[in-house]
Amino acid sequence: MSCSRAPVGSRAKRSILPALAAALALAGAACASTQGAPTRADVDTAIRARTASAGIRVDSEPPLPPDVNLGDGLTQDEAVAIALWNSPNFQATLADLGVARADLVEAGLLRNPVFSLLFPWGPKQLEFTLQYPFDLLIQRPARVDAARLNARAVGERLVWDALSLVAQVRTAHADAIAADRRLTLAEENASLTRRLAGIADARLRAGDISDLEARAPQSDAARTDVVHRALRHDRDLARLTLAALLGLDENAAPVQPQLSASYDTAPCVVDDARLKEALASRPDVRAAEIAIEAATARAHWERDRVLALVGILDANGKGDKGFEMGPGVAVDIPLFNRNQGGAARADAEVERASRLYLAARTHVIAEVRSAAARAAQAGQAMDAWTRDIVPSLETEQRQAESAYNAGETALLNVLDVSRRLVDARMQQVDAEADQFRARIALDRAMGRYCR
C-alpha cells in the first residue's frame, strides 16, 4: 500500500494556520480598553450629587457655565459653578484622569511578537523564528485590575479635590462679602468720628474743653480714617482672591459678591449617624479604600512574575522533508531570582495602603468633630451679637436720640453711642464671617453639604 505525499504548500498552510489563530487570539486579548475606569462624566455626576453645582467644563464650551450672569452680582452658588467650570488649577488636576486611563490602556496591551529571519547565504538555509512572551499574557489580568483600581482611586481623589476647591471658593466669597460690609461700616464710623472731632474742635475754640481733651477725638478720627483706607484695600484684595480662584481672565468684569440664601447657617448636629455618613461620603476615604485593592492586585501581579515563558515557532526552508515548522519554548528557570524583591515591595505597599486607610478614617472623624465644635462656638458667638449686644446698643441709640430731640442730652453723647453701635456691628460682621467659615469647613469635612 502506498500513500501519496501531500504537497509542501499544503503542509506549510496546515502549520501556519494554528500560528495565525494564536496570533488573532492574542490580538483580541490585547485590544486597548478603558472599561471600568471613571470618566469626566462620572466625576461630574459625583460632584453634582454633593454640591448641586453646574458641573465640569468641557474645553469646547464657553468660559462661564450656563445661567450665570455676572452683571447682577455674584452669588455663592454662581462662584462655585464658575470655579468648577473654569479654574485652571482644577482643570489641570482633571488631566490626571486622562493619565490614569492611559495607564489602564497600557496595562491591557500585550507585547509584540519577535520575528527573526535568517537569510540563506551559501550553504545556510532560510530560517525564521517567531517568539512571544506568554508569561505577560498570564500576568495581564492582575496588571489590568491594578491599573483599573488605580484609575478609580484617581477619580475619587479628583472629587475630593473638587470639594476642596468648593470650600476655598465659598470661603473666599464669604470673606469678600464680609470685606464689603466692613468697608461700609468703616465709612459710617469714619463719618461719626469726624463729626465728634468737629464738635470737640468747636468746644475747644469756645473754651469749654482743654487742648488735651480735644486731642482724643482728633486722634480717634485719624485712626478711623487709616482703618477705612486699610479696609478698602482689604476689600479689593478679597475680590482679587476670589477672581483668581474662579479662573477669570484679566479682561473679565470685576466680581461683585452678593449675599444669597445659599449661606445656610442652620445647625448641623454631628452624631454617630453623621460620622458614618461622613465616612461614606468622603471621596478621600473611598480613594484610600480602593488603594488597598489596587495594592493587593499589584501584589498578585508581582507574585506571578516568577516564571518567564517564551513561546517559539521555528521554521526552516530545507529540512528533511522540505519546509518544516515546529513549536518550542524558552523558560527562565527561577533558581535564584524569583522576584522576591518585587513581591516584598508589593506586600509592603499593601500594608502601607491599609495604614493610610485607617489614618484617613481617623482624620475624618477628628476633622468632623472639630469642625462641628467650631461651628457650634461660632453660632453661639453670632447669637450673642445678634440677640443681645447689637439690639441693646440699638435701643441705647434710640433712647439717646429721643433724649437729644427732647433737649435732655448733648449731640456728643448721641454720636458716641452711634460710634459704639457701629463698632459692635463691625464685630458682628466678623462673627458672621467666622460662622460662615466654620460651616463651610464642616461641609467639607462631611464630604457634602450638611443639611
Predicted regions: what is each one?
Residues 2-85, 232-277, 443-451:
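Terminal intrinsically disordered/low-complexity segments used for targeting and assembly
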Residues 94, 145-148, 211-219, 411-419:
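Short, charged, amphipathic alpha-helical segments
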